Amino acid sequence: MAASSANKSRPLANFHPTVWGYHFLSYTHEITNQEKVEVDEYKETIRKMLVEAPEGSEQKLVLIDAMQRLGVAYHFHNEIETSIQNIFDAPKQNNNLHIVSLHFRLVRQQGHYMSSDVFKQFTNQDGKFKERLTNDVQGLLSLYEASYLRVRDEEILEEALAFTTTHLKSIVSNMSNNNNSLKVEVSEALTQPIRMTLPRMEARRYISIYENNDAHNHLLLKFAKLDFNMLQKLHQRELSDLTRWWKDLDFANKYPYARDRLVECYFWILGVYFEPKYSRARKMMTKVLKMTSIIDDTFDAYATFDELEPFNDAIQRWDANAIDSIQPYMRPAYQAFLDIYSEMEQVLSKEGKLDRVYYAKNEMKKLVRAYFKETQWLNDCDHIPKYEEHMENSLVSGGYMMIPTTCLVGMEEFISIETFEWLMNDPLIVRASSLIARAMNDIVGHEVEQERGHVASLIECYMKDYGASKQEAYAKFKKDVTNAWKDINKEFFRPTEVPMFVLERVLNLTRAADTLYKEKDAYTNAKGKLKNMINSILIESVKI
């Protein structure tokens, strides 16, 4: 018989207070016309430089790579697309490991399939990479980065990753500070390869690396710095507006049991899309994510089962009249939740895009049902579900099936009904992204959650069903994460079922999970590395 929730104390988590408070209220600087003019002038100079570089040349490959890593490629989308298409259509023979690896990575990043057989020229008859390559640090680094674009069953790229990782670790430990720029770049890559790095984080770190590279392009560097600072002003202004909204709700006081993480939510969504044209979408999505976080904590860290049953029903009804059926303390959050989606409807109905909100609501209902399912398991005498059952529910309850749909709502591009239907059917790339987020979250957080009476994690379920040790479960989950990344890479190969910009949102969302859950749950424990990342992206400007 189910345990009576009335006899259970609330499962309080005692999350630490907000790191930022209302700090960003004061960031109201507007981008000046002078700044816009200066950036536009540099942009046209860089565009000319890109167009005039010989097609397929080393010069053009290196320039495109620098643009992408410095965070300014969004200005030259069409030109880069054309250049990569030309490189793909007419590849040139080359025996330079750095150039072949760079060529391979750029082509695959753009969604074109290029065979990994291009690396066979660098291997012996036994399939092992030639030892002489260990003297080519730049080549090793490029091959290392290229290996993260691998898909399943690409043994040569598995070998490449193992080979380069081993030798780069050895090289960096013995490298003198005379090669400081390259040493920093190698160290950063070993910690966070390009494929898994959030675009703004990559831009911030690469500006410093690029500046210390003697071969850097002065105009491109200046442009990247100006653009970073100009975008930072826009992002600060957005966060100021969101902080005003959050302060007016007064939810930090009304829901003291929940994680007060508005700035962290914004950083998360900034990872999904940073470009100016997505300003509206970012603000909409940040509000949704912040309210989702409160709902998640209400389920996990405060409410009793008897309170959650009518709350779940109210979400499924999506009706202001349902507010009387839920606990008084839940009502402000429920009303604010409805208001966010009503605001979306008001804005999008004028553009004939009301159907987008319908799909977003459906995904949110599905997410809350998944939260409630976990509550039912916990209430049912601490029932431990089967691993497969828990996995299917966890892929939803992690939120990574809700966000890809909802983040499209405020975007300006044309997005077809078929794309939203495709997302609703849990495509492979979304399942892979969800698995990465859930597995990484469980690895770093499951022991803490069990201490406060949380539903059994996927790790506990796997250990119970398969008689595995904790370390065996960790190894299994890490392997699953690696394979999920390979699936994401494969889903980018053209022709794709949906526009590339939709897939890019899922990729960036996955990068956010990798960033936030790599060593610990940085969203919950936001005082450490996440605070430093936010500081570098949203507070500290780049010195010109």
From Swiss-Prot:
Species in which this protein is naturally found: Solanum habrochaites
Binding-site residues for Mg(2+) 2, renumbered to this chain: D296, D300
Binding of Mg(2+) 3, residues: E449
GO MF, any single term: magnesium ion binding
Similarity field: Belongs to the terpene synthase family. Tpsa subfamily.
PANTHER family: OS04G0344100 PROTEIN-RELATED (PTHR31225), SESQUITERPENE SYNTHASE 9 (PTHR31225:SF246)
Motif (DDXXD motif): 296-300
Gene designation: TPS9
Keyword annotations from UniProtKB, A to Z: Lyase, Magnesium, Metal-binding
GO BP, sorted A to Z: diterpenoid biosynthetic process; terpenoid biosynthetic process
Pathway: Secondary metabolite biosynthesis; terpenoid biosynthesis
Principal EC category: lyase
Record protein name field: Terpene synthase 9
Cofactors required: Mg(2+); Mn(2+)
Reaction catalysis annotation: (2E,6E)-farnesyl diphosphate = (1E,4E)-germacrene B + diphosphate; (2E)-geranyl diphosphate = terpinolene + diphosphate; (2E)-geranyl diphosphate = limonene + diphosphate; (2E)-geranyl diphosphate = beta-myrcene + diphosphate
Binding-site positions, Mg(2+) 1: D296, D300
